[in-house]
Amino acid sequence: AVFGMGEGEHSYSALDITDINAPKHMWTFRNDPSNSIVSYWSANGQKTDVDYASVTPERDYSKLGQAVSTPRIIRIKVGTTDKWVAIFGAGGNGGAATAYGSAVYVIDIADKGKVLKKIDVPDKVGNSVVNSVVSAVIPVTAETTTTAVYEGALVYFADFESKLWKLNLTNKGTLYELQKLFDGEATVTNQRRVFHDVTLSLDDNSKLWAFFGTGDRYNIAAENSLINNRLFAIKDDNYPTFKTGVTSITAAQCKNVTSAGAGCPTAADDGWFVNLDANEKVSGSAAIFDRVVYFPRYIPNKLNPCNPGKAFLSAHGYTCGNTLKKINLGDGMATTPIIYKGKIYIGISGAPGSSIGSGWNAVDNLIIGNTISGS
């Protein structure tokens, strides 16, 4: 098990849980940006401190921010050797600290938590947004789909400033090559920030789509006329290959399906987007079931920003983007929806609505409803 310490620490650890009744510490590492020191704890708990100037590449945890990116464990081929690795974003920096956070780490689990690769994620120049990778990275492997005709994984993630990336961890092409697929054009004023994992799905033609939304969790109650968050669905026409030299796209190459009757994207469009309502923000990852994608959304309380706002769940055709339904869930923020056996389960931080709608009911702070038929 590999896990991070959350927003309070810049640290990850690994436990051997072969015997769940007697877990064994494997390693821990930590970044201390205030003192420019990285620390490593071995299996027996022995601690080693190294300053940034002396650190070797295999112990370079200096880009590690708040440990909020959930590690994904996969097997990749490094040279001729198969290795089990943990991959995760470098984490949070409060949207302010430029020295750390904007990277992805690939860690050798069995070999003492050494860094196999630290992949820097470029910060966009000129938008005054300090970048980071706080969401988890999402691998696509042969274990998850038969369309993955490679060893290892193609990895997708969105960074803090709403850029979508594709990372090559396969045995084909250049290992660790990073490619920008899409730029959500984040600015200080539009507040398009990504905190939540992208959700992936294949369409009927085995094209891969990445779904994610924006919303500044650091400023969840913010209200002004310049905030312009969006839902995005971006198509990767090159999947399952990693094609070099691809030019990234923006919303200009996607279909705006905000308005009713906008129509579906054509073959020439690289995806779709929806403009959220005034001050609205996405509060979790998307969920997909039966050709419908669901997004949790949040609108702050305009009259009293100290009180909870309203939680919503919107449903859209997954390749079309047309809005099938938007449900007022009640007071507070909604979690990422979980879909199980045709039912949607979604938590809410405040009081659920008294009349959510037909087919929906609340048990304390858990709201349960029926999925919507796809289009």
Model regions: which residues?
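Beta-propeller fold recognition
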Residues: A1-S375
